[in-house]
Amino acid sequence: MPPRYPFGGGAQSDEAHHQPLERRTTAEAQGNSFTHGHTAYPTYDMGAEPHSPPHVSYDPYLPPSTSGDHSGYEMPSANYNDHHRSSYPQAIHSPPRMTNPYANSQPRQGSADPFDEHDGDVPLLPRGGNYAYAPASHFDEHGNHVGPVDKYADGDDDVMDEDAVNGQARGRLLHTQVPHDDDYMPGGFDPNVLENGQAGGVRFGKIPQRVPRRYKTLKRVELYHGNLVLDCPVPSKLLDKLNDRESREFTHMRYTAATCDPDEFKTERYTLRQVLFDPPRRTELFIVLTMYNEDEELFTRTMHGVMTNIAHLCTRERSKTWGKEGWKKVVVCIVSDGRLKINSRTLACLAAMGVYQEGVGKNVVNGKPVTAHIYEYTAQLSIDPSMHFKGREKGIMPVQILFCLKERNQKKINSHRWFFNAFGQILQPNICVLLDVGTMPRPRSIYHLWKAFDINSNVGGACGEIVALKGKFWGALLNPLVAAQNFEYKMSNILDKPLESVFGYITVLPGAFSAYRYIALQNDAHGQGPLCSYFKGETLHGGQSDADVFTSNMYLAEDRILCWELVSKRDSAWILHYVKSAQAVTDVPDQVPELISQRRRWLNGSFFAGIHSIIKFGYIYRSSHSFGRKFALHIEIIYQTIQLIFSWFGMANFFIAFFILTSAMSDKIHALKVPNLVLSYIYVAFIIFCFLLSMGNRPAGSKAGYTLAMVVFALLTVYMTGAAIYLAVDSILNATGPNGGGTDALVSNRTFVNIVISLAATFGIWLIASIMFLEPMHMVTSIVQYLLMAPTFVNVISIYAFANINDISWGTKGSDKVMTDLGVVGGSGNNQVEVAIPTESKDINDAYDDAIHVLSNKAPKAGPGPVDKEQKQKDYYATVRTNVVLCWSLSNAALVVGILNISSIGTRTIYMGFLLYSVAGLALFRMMGSTIYLIKRLFSGE
């Protein structure tokens, strides 16, 4: 009877490693002799005891000859050099003829035959029946393939394999023209229901298997310094695609089961591949990608962008640091927050690149629960967002990847602790780059970011420009939410960031795309410093602290705390810098609930962190900054204080402007007096409505209410703008009339001066600054949407933020339950453990097939997620929340009453002019800073 899992044959099959048996035997002998020569390191080729069961589960279809093959897992050698190389054949640059597993099946009734269009390419979606087909029908009793031969269609790109049976057929992963349905997902589950009962049709936590795997061998392995470390051969099907198959870093993936806290990683004698090379590799750039449950499109967008940047570093052959071998100085660390939370299709991408292998990880090692699964591999292939492989022929260079899959969901700040305190302590990098999955750095951005540190040794942190994703043909700008955020991002990168960079203190380096000098972040001998302050947020939001509401909200913006602690570090003179040339694209919230929830954390965190920097400004005197730098920081802190005051009274000032303008128009047109009064009542009513919504309703649960408030405020803004235009035009007509008095009367008209000159100055400054930075398009495509959204930012989002300062649930406690679904590694004495791992080439390749198969099928569109009925409003800090909201609302109300009811009309006009000129003055101040930045940039060589 043929084997049930015929991929690659058994241990006696030449397909096992695609090489002759005698060559493999020689290679194994050489490998064994090499490993036995290094007794200081563990040997993973120990073999099984004669009385040990050969497999965890007996399979009657498994050929007996495979039971004794345990050559797959060898030691993680300290020397990854030419003396120990895999004996895989040289790279095949033209792929072999392929087999077509569907050649004898019939197409579905009423559907087009995909083979007619693709000329023999294996289609992504079979013609019918179950995807979990029985591949044994294509093999004889000896395991030899007898199926039909498929054609290979050449294309411009090497594209990812759609491996229906043997993983050798090439074709696009996603054929949009091929008829298909979404009723099937690998693994045999309903695409509309997740494993946990949620809708969406995408698994989380593991790659779905088309056929249950039972080929696991019980092996006895030595612990490496008391830790479980395995060198796992990558699938031979992946090796067939690689240009370089000689070095062990390309032929083996290294797995480490970490059972410690990140801070104890080094003391527990864990290590990483880079320090095991002879000589050890120096890490110049250490890049971290933090992710949670992002899908494969977001992941590949970021990962492919990073690999493209590394390829650019390797093209800079005249550089003293970079060049052809520059990739050896870069390590990319991917930290996924929670093993059961990771998207299965993202995991499949990692498996397709060779970074991840299903079935290797374990839950418990010698009674210690595993806290993180660490996979190390040097990938030669990149996957772009269209699901195509890109290799050396497209300029992609090898990339050292460190994939840390955390066992529990402990939030982003814990992921950064693994990055800085665990892996950073081992690698001791020069520059650390922080990226969020979903943010795509442009091809040379990382180089420009690194260059800022190389040019100026005082730079301790830097950030690039975050660009809103506009979509194809800028179609995303049709959404007013996206357009408004696009304008906001652009003006911040043109006016705010350059100004702060000139002073040397940028209030926030966005965690989505920023970089730090590693030594600048280190704590002092007493354990105090930037990283210590930064990681306080993990315990505050992990339920392990009784911190007050001020501190808790302050650490919602822990990246702002890190920036301040870095600039004010004791006996240091680090500065923060903005790099205009470094750009990264990210998608912004395009739905009302997402926008409000995101801005709630931003506003609360930035507000309380701003207060923190003002109160703790004295820390600047403990630093080693020069007198000139300290003087500049004094000016900046005054500017930040003014900004904070305007932010606090923003709600009142917007209503005052609305009331004064509409009242002035009522004086000109008496018929509008009653309608304007009604509009003022509507304005106040919706302010109250927003308070009621914010106190008891989540944005996702009250989307219609929040959207209604945003629309009403936008309409009121349109009316207010019309009133301002009418008053300006009326003033001009009166001044130029027969009895108007001409220009002198126009200049003496306070209403005209306040409205026209101040607003013209503001918009003029925006336009001039945008032209100076050679980016004026947002002034055309997005300014109207931004002006209409302005009252939403001032009223709706601010009210929600202040009304929910008690919500500090940005970080949550992870579950303390120890999972055992991956398996438990038990000790057998003498520093050895017994571990069940896939060793057969067929089983390793089958797991690789599953990953390719998952990516080969179009992901079903996720429907709206169900509302969590268990969610309830938290009452933590409720009293403080009430007091803050009362203070904020009453102070704004007092300002409104004082200006509109108590003062005279002349006072109103003066205050209106003060508001408008303040906006213009702050814009002018920012423009001066950005101009200085551009001048410095011309001479700095950035």
Curated annotation (Swiss-Prot):
What are the protein's GO molecular function terms? chitin synthase activity
For the region Disordered, what residue ranges are annotated?
1-124
What Enzyme Commission number does this protein have?
2.4.1.16
Mind telling me which Pfam families this protein's record contains?
A: Chitin_synth_1, Chitin_synth_1N
Which spans does this entry mark as compositional bias, Polar residues? Answer: 27-36
A GO cellular component entry from the record: cell periphery
Q: Which reaction does it catalyse?
A: [(1->4)-N-acetyl-beta-D-glucosaminyl](n) + UDP-N-acetyl-alpha-D-glucosamine = [(1->4)-N-acetyl-beta-D-glucosaminyl](n+1) + UDP + H(+)
- Origin superkingdom: Eukaryota
Tell me the membrane topology, using the record's own terms: Multi-pass membrane protein
- What InterPro entries is this protein classified in? Chitin_synth (IPR004835), Chitin_synth_fun (IPR004834), Chitin_synth_N (IPR013616), Nucleotide-diphossugar_trans (IPR029044)
Comp. bias (Basic and acidic residues): 14-26
Query: What compartments host this protein?
Result: Cell membrane; Cytoplasmic vesicle membrane
Q: Supply the alphabetized keyword list.
A: Cell membrane, Cell wall biogenesis/degradation, Cytoplasmic vesicle, Glycoprotein, Glycosyltransferase, Membrane, Transferase, Transmembrane, Transmembrane helix
* Primary site of residence: membrane
Inducing or repressing factors: Expression is up-regulated in the mycelial form and shows a maximal expression in the log phase at about 14-18 h of incubation.
Top-rank EC class of the record's enzyme: transferase
Q: Which residues cross the membrane?
A: 641-661, 674-694, 709-729, 755-775, 783-803, 885-905, 909-929
What does the protein in this record do?
A: Polymerizes chitin, a structural polymer of the cell wall and septum, by transferring the sugar moiety of UDP-GlcNAc to the non-reducing end of the growing chitin polymer.
Q: Give the family, as the similarity comment puts it.
A: Belongs to the chitin synthase family. Class I subfamily.
Protein name (Swiss-Prot/TrEMBL): Chitin synthase 4
